Amino acid sequence: MKTEDFRDNEYLEEYLKELWGNGANIAIAKLNDLINWGRSNSVWPLTFATSCCGIEFMCLGAARYDFARFGWEVTRNSPRQADVVFCCGTIVHKMAPVLKRLYDQMSEPKYVIALGSCAISGGPFKSSYHTIMGIDKIIPVDVYIPGCPPRPDAMIYGMIQLARKIKVQNFFKLPNLSHIEGNSLKKGERQ
């Protein structure tokens, strides 16, 4: 494959179909695993903190818990550079459009971790008229970390769960080639 062909996504998709049709699905699966390994070990987080869970989140950067050992050390101030947003605290109706815009500005693939009972279900403020009953009403959530506030150990466990989720995702869109003779795999299925 010539270098200039890498600029065109359609050419790459056709090349993948050709590889898949010729039985090179093992190579694609291994490349998928390699890319997912790299993505899961170099996640750039963005913190959207509105209350006390954000204060507890700061413990992760200290020496005792040190979330840099999991590859999460490069925190970002811009959603355009972040892979995951940690939503910590109560979200009121006035903050909902801000959170939605922040999520929309993130590049794909993007992940969301709801941190604490306020972000998950409204927490102790759930009976208030201005509180949203969980951020999953606004944006899709990948990992929920309960607690008021959750301990740093629970936050690290949630980060590990998200890394596991990233490792099993398909980076390449594999074509549906169930019509090819001798191909027993369905779309998205791996050997």
UniProtKB/Swiss-Prot annotation:
It is found in: Cell inner membrane. It comes from the Bacteria. GO terms for molecular function: 4 iron, 4 sulfur cluster binding; iron ion binding; NADH dehydrogenase (ubiquinone) activity; NADH:ubiquinone reductase (non-electrogenic) activity; quinone binding. GO terms for cellular component: plasma membrane; respiratory chain complex I. It catalyses: a quinone + NADH + 5 H(+)(in) = a quinol + NAD(+) + 4 H(+)(out). It is an enzyme of class 7 (translocase). It holds the Pfam family Oxidored_q6. It is a peripheral membrane protein. Binds 1 [4Fe-4S] cluster. [4Fe-4S] cluster binds at C52, C53, C118, C148. Belongs to the complex I 20 kDa subunit family. This is NADH-quinone oxidoreductase subunit B. It comes from Azobacteroides pseudotrichonymphae genomovar. CFP2. The lineage of its organism: Bacteria, Pseudomonadati, Bacteroidota, Bacteroidia, Bacteroidales.
